[in-house]
Design a protein with these regions (language model features):
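Phosphate-handling active-site elements
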Residues: 105-107, 130-133
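N-terminal glycine-rich flavin-associated loop
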Residues: 111-130
Length: 133
């Protein structure tokens, strides 16, 4: 089997690597500290972190959002709840992109590619009603 990446997948992998290096890794320690302090103080660690929300917006702007979804996924719900995007990558092409995300514990969250959300989105996209999508 040929595991060569298509140029589009190689480009996405390289862009994800650069984003992780330039944007995510520099804030990891501070984010970990904030999360730890919230948990230790009994605070709600599920409250969206404004720094992470900012990085998510940047990732979306750069076309690095929901890379696991089929191409051209869109709609009212998708726009409202941030599930739009998608590149239609094969598993072979997505694997190195996911590997690049794996360099940071925050990256899957920033790129909206974290489990179990990815699987849930794929199931709803394929089998859900228009409202669920």
């Amino acid at each position: 089997m040929d595991f060569s990446l298509f140029p589009r997948a190689a480009d996405l992998r390289d862009r994800v690597r650069a984003f992780v290096t330039d944007e995510i890794e520099p804030i990891e320690a501070a984010a970990h500290t904030r999360i730890t302090r919230l948990r230790e103080s009994g605070g709600d660690s599920w409250t969206p972190d404004p720094v992470i929300k900012g990085l998510q917006a940047k990732a979306r702007e750069q076309g690095l959002w929901n890379l696991f979804l089929p191409a051209a996924h869109a709609g009212t719900y998708a726009a409202d709840f941030g599930t739009d995007g998608g590149e239609g990558l094969s598993n072979v092409d997505y694997a190195p992109v996911a590997e690049a995300m794996g360099r940071s514990f925050l990256a899957p969250l920033v790129f909206n590619s974290n489990a179990p959300d990815t699987g849930n989105m794929e199931v709803l996209l394929k089998y859900g009603t228009d409202e669920q999508r």
